[in-house]
Each structure stands twice: as C-alpha cells, then as structure tokens.
Amino acid sequence: MSRRGALLRCLFLAAIAAATSAAEENNPVTRAGPPRGTLLIVGGGAMGGLWDVFLRLAGGKESEIVVIPTAATTVDGEDAVLGVLRTRGAVRVTQLHTRDRSAADSEAFCAPLRSAKAVWITGGRQWRLTDAYLGTRVQRELEALLARGGVIGGSSAGATIQGSYLVRGSPRDNRIMMSPGHEEGFGFLRASAIDQHVDTRGRADDLRPVLRAHPALLGVGLDEATAIIVRGDEAEVVGKGQVRFFPAPEAAVHVLRAGERFDLGARRLSTASR
C-alpha cells in the first residue's frame, strides 16, 4: 500500500472511530437501566425526604410534573400527591388519568407528557396501570420522556410497574406473585422484577419463586421509605431501609443501605460501593 493510501486508510478509520464514539455518547449502551433519563423506584410507605429527592431529580420546583394515579381503586378529583408536591413548592403539576385504552392511545390525552420533565406514578394495584396503559401511546410517551433525559418516579405499584416482569399483578389477590395475563410491566428497568413493602409485610424471600421460574431476571426488593435512583446501569440506594438485589434464583442476596450502589448490568456491587 502506498504512503498516500495508508494515510487515507488511517484517516478513514479515525473517522469511523469518532463517529462510533459520538453515537455511543448520544445513545449510550446499557444492559438494564435506561440509556437516558433517571428512575426513582420507591418501596412504598412514608416518603419523607424522598419527595425532595424527586423534585431535585426533576430539575426543581419550576419543572413540569405529571402525576398518574391510575393504580388507585378510585380516582375522584385530584390525587393527594398533587397537593403534597405543591406544598413542597412544585408549581406546574398536572394529573393524567384514564381507564379507557382508546383515550390512552390518543394524542390529545398524552399532550402533557410531551412537555413534562418528570412523571410520578402513585401506589395502588399495578394491574390497573397495565390494563390502562401497557402498549399504548402513554407508555411510548413515558419512554420518550426518559429518552430526552426526563425522570420517572413511583412508589409501591408505581415502583413495580417500572420493572419488565410484573410481580403481584393478579387482580384477585396481591399475594399472588405470578399471574398469567398480568406479568408484563413497562420495562424501564429491563430484565427485572421489582417488589415493595418488603420489611413491613415480610416479603424478604417472595421474589425467589419468580426468579426460579424466570432465571434471567434481576430481583429487586425494596423496604418502605427506601428507594433506588437508577441512572444507566447504576442504582444508588436512598432512604431509611434496605434494598435487596437478587442476581440469580439461588444466588446470595446483596443487601444495600443508603449511599451504597449496585451495578445493575453486572449484577454486583458497583466499584463505588466496594
């Protein structure tokens, strides 16, 4: 190869490397967490300072926030969460609710999501969320919100729905861990099953049967008043209690407290925690 040809080849390879680096920067590759955006996944119970964490992640009190209360048994007027957020200084809070899938698929209904910086999904029963929104424009707009760097938070049912496998999805009884027809979550945290209220309801090992049936899943069990902040493949624990990470059906559980971090992709303590 001539010197000129070699130079051109080097320039060509450098251009490919630069383009690849730029593409990875714009579309980072992750194995579990969202490539863009942030998740706040709360184990239920009293929120306390976790509301301030949510508002900080959302970009402050002026950010547009949408509250989705559909997991509740009934939604009569504004959900109490809107008042809580306003009391803490949020000034642009909107409620979004329907049980009509055709409405959930409409552009007009989803309009608030397109300008929102953050979304909060309240507690209740997670099957109501999938019946209303799974596979609709609402779910696609939530994914788009994350893709533009937004924040999705939720507690209890609003936590479990963020996993890919929906535990306790049975409309009959929330003690049923696997319910055919209600086993798919929104999948913001991929290849995962998320449980909540672990400490107060004696659920420390309830995820084991799910993981034996679906061994590719990462199990995440959250105490009340406790959360993980997920950015990319890293989860940081915040709050009062513990978070249990089950990397495999029979593997030892990793129990983390506030300030500790877990690598969701590698399924081990992150280097920051070690």
Segments (PLM) and residue ranges:
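Portal/gating segments that form or line small-molecule/metal binding sites
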Residues: 66, 72-115, 121, 128
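Glycine/threonine-rich flexible loop motifs
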Residues: 126-136
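Catalytic nucleophile loop
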Residues: 120-123, 142-166
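C-terminal and late-domain segments of enzyme folds
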Residues: 24-61, 72-79, 84-87, 92, ...
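Bacterial N-terminal signal peptides
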Residues: 9-18
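Catalytic-core regions built around general acid/base machinery
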Residues: 112-115, 135-149
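Twin-arginine (Tat) signal peptide motif
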Residues: 2-10
